[in-house]
């Protein structure tokens, strides 16, 4: 089997999984139709005259305006409790001291001194709680969909009707300053704008200070009708430090001064709106739907009396989208066409000078009626354009609205029993509006069951292919190359057929369906052909070759994907499953008798065969490996982030950056520990390379390990020092610190890239020495005429070269007898593959560590230690000298996958959007990336899926390590002085003198080597594919579950992206092994050619 065939076959299998994931995703992730219809003053939302109070008003549009100006202060991530008044201390209870409590004192003073002028609300936010989706909701009044969360940093212009567009249509002057996301959402919509980059979450002050530079001059200038200021410091402080850091108190105090300054400058016709777009978790993150994330603050204030009654003791809870119709009607604008929010009715009370006895209540009902008309029109238009809305519920709501609207018109003609009638109308309109919103929330989950079923079936078929092909890969005489040509031909045929039908019918070619058709068309013929060929060549093997204990553990893990409760505790369940598998591995060694004490060796009689070799590992050695692995797994579990659903859990404080620490001494101690972890990791790898002799090679990769990697450690340590103390630097040095913070990470990443290039260029780390031969003249090479011209010739001569190369490789150069022949000795061939793999993993680990917070370097150290111990434990029970094909056991692959998952959680990640480490996008780019989105996405993705990448690239070590751990056979007994054995070597002792072949044993059977790599890749893809299949089935079966968008959908997305990263890493890792193998073949060929001269 050729190397190219192995890579192509694995790439084809990956394509099958990709096609299944894409097809399932296109049918599962909800979307909704965005209507481009617009409201206008000339077209009322429903039949009938202008509402009450609009007659005789100049420029009346649906309702007369109450305010001519609005100042909207949007404080990003202003959680409700940040603005909640601090309660007085109750005697007998411990005082509460939290940095964010009571810092917005101006709000509390207004609520106490002017209760009719200001009001604080708890704004209930619709998930996802990402900034771009919240801005869309705050301007359109529509509900976001789950798929919108992926567009948070790829904002596009809003095409739906919105408040900004209505302001422009009415000729109002809109001035904006702050978050530059608004520029992408509303291009050219502002009469004046001051945009500031919003993506650098480590920068707490640039945006806010830039706003303050223009806010008060613009406010006093008067050339505006709506002024919008979007502050980002609170949100960035939460991302960088969390809400409990003293910096949060400073930032909130700054916002309080801003609010107080605005209140002092407002005129009577101006409304002040202070709002948070979303909240934040206890860690300062957002994006999910936890109570802290969906609870934002909303404060309204006017110099004139705004509310007819005093505020309640507990602030009222209102949907965030209610602000859109409220602002539109208060400003005399049409409500945006797609709004689903409900007006805040108490803001529409009639004045005390009105002639109507119930003017206040009637004005509120009129606002609700207009709002209900607008929502009813939207539902009618939307249901006509798509079939998303439930017909039965839609009909019930339309009946409710028709009755309430008729009763309202009748009341205007005959206002009898006004108080009871108005109360009934208010309740009916509110019931309709809330029911309509609930209908939209429930119905905007557009599932295509056909695509979901097709995607799941394609994933299941790909898993079956991996299971079947992994058995066929090591079958004698089985050829994959001709078998692969059939599915490729069928896939191309079905692709051309589908494209031709689409073009003929005039329908648009769907790339997702095209890929699925190609995948299915290529997969089914292969399964049929493989099954027939398999059955004809040998008896049927069991369909489930996975050992029963491993199968049980795998089924338990897959079953947990169907429970939201297990998702919550997966970070703790994964180490338990890993520990159970380690216990099974140790128990298996015990069952095989490898944990028993070795029997005493007996001397054989003269002339008998030599004694057998001792076991490769003692029982105590394997037992200590298992205990050490469990201990390191437990230590890695100390680094954990608690999910939102476990409020009693406390996340590890070690996952926060050193910059968030207050104590200087503790920060210095932790910094020393982090640098120590870097040094220890480098030392461990260098000691390992030195043990196997690869560190003595003069090749460029080894020289880079000696000199380049210490520079990488130094650069990383220097960057951490600057990042942890950048805010404490003197002002005159801050520019230098900022420049160094950009240069150092790029230098480390550049060095890592250089090391990988050198490794690919010269991957063979072998030391060759030439010297005078000893007195022994025994010839070690079988006579061979001419250079090797085929792979078979090379496979024949290579083992002979290596078995005696360290003793005497006799050249045929022309030398005098006095000088003697020249001997060439080569070292480190036994670990040539593993040395390249370990070096590559270390080169990848340093940039990935740089993308994490400093203390996660301890997790990376534990990662390498866990991997080394697991590899040694697996090697203890894997025979390498037995005849037959090479293979990697299922329990080894399962343990490797579990270790990758455990490291994912230990590095502070969770399969939820709110736990994504956005700060990684600014490592090396403190000033942001401009308009580029692919580079920050790459950095954040590398941070999130670092464990998937490292373990996938290192997967071939599962095959290589047992050969690396092959030990030397028994040494030759010392001859008696003066005996004949001093001058002659017996054949028995000659066999005992042989060095272990170790990884060169793989060179004895290159076809078996390539087949083993293929089988390893298929087994790894099977386990990963089984996990993504389980997530897809869970999401489809539980698509109407309460937690589908909170738990199952994010888990599916993370598993899907993790599978893609792992599959790419697996291909790269196997390709690197093959590159080393090609280089080793070329190296041997050069030696043979030199021998011929």
From Swiss-Prot:
Its EC number is 2.-.-.-. Signal peptide: none annotated. It is found in: Endoplasmic reticulum membrane. Pathway: Glycolipid biosynthesis; glycosylphosphatidylinositol-anchor biosynthesis. The chain crosses the membrane at residues 4-24, 460-480, 483-503, 512-532, 669-689, 702-722, 748-768, 831-851, 856-876, 945-965, 1018-1038, 1052-1072. Belongs to the PIGG/PIGN/PIGO family. PIGO subfamily. PANTHER family: GPI ETHANOLAMINE PHOSPHATE TRANSFERASE 3 (PTHR23071:SF1), PHOSPHATIDYLINOSITOL GLYCAN (PTHR23071). This is GPI ethanolamine phosphate transferase 3, catalytic subunit.
